[in-house]
Amino acid sequence: MALREGPTPARFLPEGLVFCVEGNIGCGKSTLVKALMERVAGSGVNVVEEPVDQWVNHNGKNYLELSYTDPTGYAVPFQNLVFDSYVNVQRLQNPDIMERSPMSATRVFCAVNGSRGVIPATALPGMAARGEAVMRTIATRPVFVYLELPPEECLRRMRRRDRTGEAGVGLDYLRLLHERYEAWLSSAEDVERVDASRSREEIVDRVIEILCRRHPRLRAPLTRKSQL
């Protein structure tokens, strides 16, 4: 994947501090991140969605969908594409708040695909090293905001939204992802847990409270009159 060119925007938060919204497929990350983007529009806070657009149309192929329908053939190319896309995120968007991160790509998705045998064991150490190297270019002091939701509810939400490329995702896979998320974030250094079974408004309010508490400078842009 060719790295994209362009100016790197200034950050709102101190260098190295990034809030990463994490959680299983279907837990509500995109909805939350879009709400935060609306709240801070024009304030200089860089809120960045997961770079799915770079995965669903790369050289004419939907690598996200292929990673589900043909994991043996596409799990490794897809994960490498994910890492490249996060390099572009850092260079062109320089996030203060971001949806997922290179760490979850390695600690969750690569680990699950390794356990399923679709990523060779010999490839895992190199992929983990690359993911963590990319992460260090984005954040040296990440705070993980973890949206907790049972995999059964994640599946119900996925089926309702019927997003392109997700038809091949089943409950067993979601359970594996959930287990890996729990194992990783139970021992991670800086994690804020959020009950994602609450209403959209309650989740947004809870996350705003966390962000303002963790860095008071975010209070002004996040507590302006809601545009939601």
UniProtKB/Swiss-Prot annotation:
InterPro entries per record: Deoxyribonucleoside_kinase (IPR050566), DNK_dom (IPR031314), P-loop_NTPase (IPR027417)
Enzyme class: transferase
Listed GO biological process terms: DNA biosynthetic process
Organism lineage: Viruses, Duplodnaviria, Heunggongvirae, Peploviricota, Herviviricetes
Annotated binding of ATP, by residue: G23, N24, I25, G26, C27, G28, K29, S30, R157
Family: Belongs to the DCK/DGK family.
Keyword Transferase: yes
Protein's name according to its UniProt entry: Thymidine kinase
SUPFAM superfamilies per UniProt: P-loop containing nucleoside triphosphate hydrolases (SSF52540)
EC code: 2.7.1.21
Tree of life domain: Viruses
Keywords tagged on the record: ATP-binding, DNA synthesis, Kinase, Nucleotide-binding, Transferase
GO molecular function annotations of the record: ATP binding; thymidine kinase activity
Active site residues of this protein: E50 (proton acceptor)
Catalytic activity: thymidine + ATP = dTMP + ADP + H(+)
Pfam family for this entry, one: dNK
Annotated organism of origin: Ictalurid herpesvirus 1 (strain Auburn)
Record keyword Nucleotide-binding present: yes
UniProt binding sites for substrate: Y68, Q79, F109
